[in-house]
A protein has these predicted regions:
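Internal, conserved structured core segments that host functional sites
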Residues: 91-154, 162
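A general structural signal for short secondary-structure junctions and capping/turn motifs
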Residues: 3-4, 127-129, 191
């Protein structure tokens, strides 16, 4: 794929609280990232859905997602569909997620699964920032191919970096890396034949 076809999608969103109600403060989106707001009942917290309109990412593509809940705001965010990472051509597919929960705020990040296809080269960085009395709930699921279609990905590279900051101080760092996919998937001390993990 020519470099002119590669994408660098961006989505930035922040929320603030006024009179004990949460409001959208800032919104920026750059193709193929879109942010949608489903209808909600008056007593429900604000919900936003992130959409990747390209249907997936390939080698050299990059997505940056930044979410911030300001003091006392409450928000739930999710992905509209599974993220798909296809076979790569030398360059990795990169996703950067930055989530910030300020003092007294509540942020839920509930993505659907990321599906890694055969020979994918995937890098993801999750940076989580929580301030005093802030609350943050985060989920993550990786699928090695589509089990229902009889797929099991045994070739490719995964690198996931997790950073957790409390009051701007790094308290947790995890660097997860797999390059010998077939060995890790089959080994009893690895995934032991499982094609999904969270």
């Amino acid at each position: 794929i020519g470099s002119n076809l590669l994408t660098h999608g961006k989505g930035y969103i922040s929320f603030e609280s006024k009179d004990e109600k949460t409001y959208l403060k800032d919104l920026y989106q750059e193709n193929p990232v879109k942010i949608l707001f489903p209808k909600k009942l008056s007593n429900e917290i604000i919900t936003a859905a992130f959409v990747t309109t390209s249907g997936g990412i390939v080698g050299g593509d990059k997505l940056d997602i930044i979410v911030k809940t300001c003091k006392k705001s409450e928000v739930q965010l999710y992905q509209q569909a599974a993220e798909k990472v296809y076979k790569n051509h030398k360059k990795p597919s990169i996703i950067n997620i930055s989530l910030t929960s300020e003092e007294g705020s509540w942020l839920e990040w509930l993505p659907q699964e990321t599906i890694l296809f055969e020979n994918s080269n995937y890098i993801k960085k999750n940076s989580l920032h929580v301030n005093t009395n802030g609350r943050l709930m985060v989920g993550e699921m990786l699928f090695l191919g589509r089990h229902a279609m009889g797929e099991i990905n045994t070739k490719g590279t995964i690198r996931e970096i997790w950073e957790i900051f409390f009051d701007e101080r790094l308290i947790w760092l995890d660097n997860f890396y797999i390059d010998d996919m077939d060995y890790i998937v089959k080994h009893p001390a690895g995934l032991n034949g499982a094609n999904a993990f969270a």
